[in-house]
Swiss-Prot record:
Domain of life assignment: Bacteria
Lineage, opening ranks: Bacteria, Pseudomonadati, Spirochaetota, Spirochaetia, Leptospirales
An example Gene Ontology molecular-function term: translation elongation factor activity
Subcellular localization, as worded in the UniProt entry: Cytoplasm
UniProt family annotation: Belongs to the elongation factor P family.
Cellular component per GO, a single term: cytoplasm
Chief location category: cytoplasm
Protein name per UniProt: Elongation factor P
Transmembrane regions: none
Keywords: Cytoplasm, Elongation factor, Protein biosynthesis
A GO biological process held by the record: peptide biosynthetic process
């Protein structure tokens, strides 16, 4: 769908020079002299990088519609994660690169939203939190309570994270997947 610059809004997805970008920020400028333009901050959906771009009033932009599907992780295979569509149970490989940093904290059957463009997966939106059991934790040193004492633990999926020293093996913890930090202990 073709848009004029005044129709561009935050959250839209645009096709610019063959790449897909999500609009992060827009600023419409109408100077006293000369023609109007719009300054934008765009996030590349395939490369996960951001650019700032200015579009002149006469330019036409192409808006695209993305399909979002609720899917769950089945298993990993080579460089792919095999997802299953929650509606029709179709299995589809998706590149690990979309969730590479949080993969060690994801269990099988974790629900996620997978974004598609022209039938191909272009992004994965993971949940904000993961609840996992601690499988290995060293004992905290007695008296080591100055500041925010932390230790390294391993969770059931094999991921390692820093947690407060009171967390023990067998505890179930909540991890924030946006920044890979410990949130709290949860009851079993």
């Amino acid at each position: 769908m073709t848009l004029g610059i005044t129709e561009v809004k935050k959250g839209m997805v645009l096709k610019v020079e063959g790449d897909l970008y999500s609009v992060v920020k827009t600023e419409f400028v109408n100077p006293g002299k000369g023609s109007a333009f719009i300054r934008t901050k765009l996030k590349n959906l395939t490369r996960n990088s951001s650019i700032e771009r200015t579009f002149k009033a006469a330019e036409k932009l192409e808006s695209v519609e993305l399909e979002k599907r609720n899917m769950t992780i089945c298993y990993t295979e080579g460089d792919d994660i095999i997802f299953m569509d929650s509606n029709d149970f179709e299995q589809m490989p998706v590149s690990k690169e979309y969730v590479e940093d949080i993969l060690p904290f994801l269990k099988e059957e974790t629900p996620m939203e997978v974004t598609f463009y022209e039938g191909k997966p272009i992004g994965v939106i993971p949940p904000n939190f993961s609840i996992l059991e601690v499988t290995y934790a060293e004992e905290g040193l007695k008296g080591d309570t100055s500041g925010t004492a932390q230790k390294r633990i391993t969770v059931e999926t094999g991921g390692e994270i820093n947690v407060p020293i009171f967390v023990k093996q067998g505890d179930v913890i909540k991890i924030d997947l946006r920044d890979l930090t410990y949130v709290e202990r949860v009851s079993k």
